[in-house]
Amino acid sequence: MKLSYTEIFKHSDILNPISATSLLSAGKLAQLEPKSTILDLGSGKAFPSLLWANTFGATVEGFDINRDYVEYANSRAKMLNLSNRVKYSCKDIRKLRLDKKYDVVAFLGLGMTQVYGKNSDVLKIFESLLNKDGILILAEPVWLVKPVSSEGLKALGEAETSFLTEAEMRHLMGESGFQVLRHYVSSKEDWELYVRPVYIAMQEIMKSKSQLADEAQKIINGFKAEYAAVGQHWNMLLWVAKMH
């Protein structure tokens, strides 16, 4: 039996190591306002897009494959009195077909190649969903240097092709028709706030469901490896880029 993302991130609001401060700064840079429309792809528990909707008055449409997360996100929207302009739906974003465009597309930390495949193809998908001069807000892990050591790849359970370096990412965006306005680098504290709730959730599993203790410990070890690799092999960057 495998633990679900719902169980792993039971106590987590945001499912990646990005601070609310960075998200608010990104929203300001994107010039979010009440008439802005946001598409949140892989919305998770929707902390970022709910923050933008609540702060800037934007309208949000989000999609995630996890039904528990979608129900949670919609309940949060209702609690914040945002249901009239914020809605989340349960769909596989890889199969999503939309016939409209948005002012902002957000894709936060899912991993472009893991979800869509080739990086350049992913950016074309985002471009097709944006209005003229639209903004892409993208969170993506980056390698600090290449080649990545075999020890680092093994510890993270990743291939070197999983992610780009910062320079490669910036170059790819430029080639794909995006002008990078700014990027925000996750701090060690951001990562601590990301991994700590997972440790708590897994420790609860280990105490209450002994048959899942080994699986829970593996998950803890995986998150510890991610945290240890920050500043050594990789980090998370939040990009704000304008289509041109």
Where are these regions (language model features)?
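Conserved alpha-helix/loop element of class I SAM-dependent methyltransferases that forms part
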Residues: 16-34
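Conserved class I S-adenosyl-L-methionine
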Residues: 36-44
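Class I SAM-dependent methyltransferase SAM/SAH-binding core
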Residues: 48-94
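A short acidic, Gly/Pro-enriched loop at the edge of an enzyme's catalytic core
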Residues: 97-105
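A short SAM/SAH-binding and catalytic strip from SAM-dependent methyltransferases
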Residues: 104-118
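A short glycine-rich, Lys/Arg-flanked "PGG" loop and its adjoining helix->strand segment in the class I
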Residues: 120-135
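Short, glycine-/aromatic-enriched active-site segment of Class I SAM-dependent methyltransferases
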Residues: 141-160
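Conserved Class I S-adenosyl-L-methionine
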Residues: 182-244
